[in-house]
From Swiss-Prot:
The keyword Transcription applies. Its EC number is 3.6.4.-. Keywords: ATP-binding, Helicase, Hydrolase, Nucleotide-binding, RNA-binding, Transcription, Transcription regulation, Transcription termination. This is Transcription termination factor Rho. The keyword Oxidoreductase does not apply. Residues 70-145 form the Rho RNA-BD domain. ATP binds at residues 188-193, 200-205, 231.
């Protein structure tokens, strides 16, 4: 479980909170097995060392209830096609398990719950013939009292606008990645950005730098990192490197699981935007997500080059297209990586389909990465639409003068020139003034 995932008790104050004694499910999930055994012995669970970890947590909570305690649980609602739902834990994978909490169709209708809602409530343990915990009483929805969200708008009815507030990525003088992006490919709240990345060009490190810049400069932004079809060690590294919430579906899981995780993360982000919040989703990668959709989409009989079904890209485009700045308040920013030069014709077709859908492109170059220059950022090819709204007239003029100078250089010379000058200055303002003097 990601330690930085928000919980009801630690991150938000809820007016309707009922005092609850004992241990909470989300707390037990973070404890090492040794501590769980210690708690079990304290509660006088019989033979605790014979239980598997998940079963031991179950026994602790069941014993706690029989001794007069309550269970308070915070989870993300996943609504099934039959109308009922489950609260999934913040373990980063929304995996099915006996610790999930059942939510009845009547509760979903009564409180107008939606997919991706973060629900906090009192939970009872399973009875003899039941497999799951059951939600008894809802305390809060999306960290707010339930009566406050009854009139919340629907995400699809909100008005999209061009991004008009820049997300500052510059956070340390020596970390030039964020500084370069702030000038040459600025990211605003509500941006739909594509990181175009050949293999081994440092896209994972770039994602970490983006996450660090966002969390350092914008504490009001809720950061979500979504890793699809990634290696397990990459997931662990990301969880330990960034402060945002990391959700993942690793390459050893089926395509259906990739899609389920991605869609639940998107629904969760939409629910927060409906509440007027600013949310940033870093997706690695849109290519692998599109591959997963292609694997599960029934054949339409129309196959594009590379084996991509004509209908397979509609849903990943809908995912990417959800990014928008909202006129009524709030924003959803999606920064996704797109893989190129992998040797796969399918990946090239997917990239071509997504190339025109974003309003910002961050291009990484293999020839720059081969020179061991990081970030392998192709300044000349990268850019943001309507960047005049984000940068302002004065800064935009200076950036365009600098771009005109660099047009006479190749991509490696341009990056080396900017990199060396940024190393001599403490921030972008000083860098632009230095360039202006020349």
């Amino acid at each position: 479980m990601n330690e930085n995932a928000p919980t009801h008790k630690s991150s938000h104050k809820v007016k309707t909170h009922t005092p609850v004694s004992g241990y909470h499910i989300e707390d037990l999930r973070t404890y090492p097995t040794e501590k769980l055994l210690e708690i079990a012995n304290k509660l006088k669970v019989e033979n605790p060392q014979e239980f598997k970890r998940q079963d031991l947590m179950f026994e602790i909570l069941k014993t706690q209830v029989t001794q007069g305690g309550y269970i308070l649980f915070t989870g993300i609602l996943e609504i099934m096609p039959d109308g009922y739902g489950f609260l999934r834990g913040f373990d980063g994978s929304f995996s099915d398990g006996h610790n999930d909490t059942y939510v009845s169709p009547s509760q979903i209708r009564r409180f107008a719950l939606r997919n991706g809602d973060i629900v906090t409530g009192q939970v009872r343990s399973p009875k003899d013939q039941e497999k799951y915990y059951a939600l008894l009483k809802i305390e809060a929805i999306n960290y707010s009292p339930s009566d406050e969200i009854r009139n919340r708008p629907l995400f699809d009815n909100l008005t999209p606008l061009f991004p008009d507030e820049q997300i500052k990525l510059e956070y340390e003088p020596t970390k030039v990645t964020g500084r370069m992006l702030d000038l040459f490919s600025p990211v605003g709240k509500g941006q739909r950005a594509l990181i175009v990345a050949p293999p081994r060009t440092g896209k994972t490190e770039l994602m970490k730098e983006l996450a660090q810049g966002i969390t350092s400069n914008h504490p009001e932004v809720e950061l979500i990192i979504l890793l699809v079809d990634e290696r397990p060690e990459e997931v662990t590294d990301m969880q330990r490197s960034v402060k945002g919430q990391v959700f993942s579906s690793t390459f050893d899981l089926p395509a259906n699981n990739h899609i389920r995780i991605a869609e639940l993360v998107l629904e969760r982000a939409k629910r927060r935007v409906e509440m007027g919040k600013d949310v940033v989703v870093l997706l690695d990668s849109i290519t692998r997500l599109a591959r997963a959709y292609n694997a599960v989409t029934p054949s339409s009989g129309k196959v594009l080059s590379g084996g991509v079904d004509a209908n397979a890209l509609h849903r990943p485009k809908r995912f990417f297209g959800a990014a928008r700045n909202i006129e009524e308040g709030g924003s959803l920013t999606i920064i996704a990586t797109a893989l190129i030069e992998t040797g796969s014709r399918m990946d090239e077709v997917i990239f071509e389909e997504f190339k025109g859908t974003g309003n910002s492109e961050i291009v990484l170059a293999r020839n720059i990465a081969d020179r061991r220059i990081y970030p392998a950022f192709d300044i000349l090819k990268s850019g943001t639409r309507k960047d005049n709204i984000l940068l302002g007239k004065d800064r935009l003029t200076k950036v365009w003068v600098l771009r005109n100078v660099m047009q006479q250089m190749d991509d490696i010379e341009a990056l080396s020139f900017v990199y060396s000058k940024m190393q001599q200055t403490k921030d972008n303002e000083e860098f632009l003034n230095l360039m202006n003097e020349k």
